[in-house]
A protein has these predicted regions:
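Conserved hydrophobic/aromatic beta-strand scaffold that supports enzyme active sites
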Residues: 9, 66, 84, 101-103, ...
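Short acidic-glycine loop/turn motifs at beta-strand connectors
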Residues: 12-15, 106-108, 182
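Cys/His-rich short segments
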Residues: 53-105
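N-terminal strand-loop-strand
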Residues: 83-125, 130-131, 159
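The catalytic Nudix box helix
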Residues: 126-161, 176, 184
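Active-site-adjacent beta-strand/loop module that shapes the phosphate/pyrophosphate-binding cleft
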Residues: 164-186
Length: 240
């Protein structure tokens, strides 16, 4: 049975209230656990939004149980949208961490894709990173691409394409396309294992052969690559 310390009000749509319940390890329910990455592309926009909100709120509650001022356990308030300290009466709210993700292309219309050091051999995606304190999103694009692969970006070429909440743990991904002013790359050894410049023909042939696997269609990276590609990507090219 859900109580006010385990139920989260996700929102109201057409007079229907949507509620998420945080389960503990001792629950009698035997759920089938799947990740948002696994099912996101199959859900409706409403269900995706609800799932993202539930994941973001539940993660925040699990990692911010104590008051940062006095250390006491805080209580869930505002139907799950805040936590309040019983001693200080201070209310704490979920925080969102901005991050950029960018499809870098060159003057030959090739796209720059990278494989992170902890990914399988054929997994490739666009470059991404967190926006630092006091930094604009545009400056973060230039810095992250320079730090991760040693490529310089033409700042005036930046084009904002859209955003996606990504609750792992609390990111808001801000998607861009950008023109590289240099093409020679040097991957950051602690983050990037491999980098490739790919034409549209090379991308399709390597994806068809299995040499390359792209992000899940539920991820904004898929849509950034698709924007550069100029037509719908083959769903079979995804890593699943």
């Amino acid at each position: 049975m859900a109580d006010e310390q385990s139920a989260l009000l996700l929102g109201i749509d057409s007079d229907h209230a949507y509620i998420a319940v945080m389960l503990d390890e001792n629950t009698d329910v035997a759920p089938l656990w799947v990740t948002l990455r696994d099912v996101g592309a199959q859900l409706s926009p409403l269900d995706v939004g609800l799932a993202i909100t539930a994941t973001a709120l539940a993660t925040w509650h699990n990692t911010h149980r104590y008051c940062p001022q006095c250390g006491l356990t805080t209580q869930i308030s505002d139907a799950g949208w805040s936590r309040t300290c019983p001693k200080d009466c201070v209310t704490h709210f979920p925080r969102t961490e901005p991050a950029i993700i960018v499809a870098v292309h060159d003057s030959e219309e090739r796209i720059l894709l990278g494989r992170r050091t902890n990914w399988p051999e054929n997994w490739y995606s666009t470059l991404a990173g967190f926006v630092e304190a006091g930094e604009s999103c545009e400056a973060a694009v230039v810095r992250e691409v320079r730090e991760e692969v040693g490529v310089e970006i033409d700042l005036e070429s930046l084009q904002y394409l859209g955003s996606q909440p990504w609750p792992y743990p609390a990111s808001l991904m801000l998607g861009y396309s950008a023109l590289a002013s240099t093409t020679e790359f040097k991957p950051s050894e602690d983050e990037i294992a491999q980098i490739r410049w790919l034409s549209r023909e090379e991308l399709s042939s390597q994806c068809e052969s299995g040499i390359l696997k792209l992000p899940n269609p539920a991820a904004i990276s898929w849509h950034l690559i698709e924007h550069w590609y100029g037509q719908p990507l083959n769903p079979e090219w995804t890593r699943g």
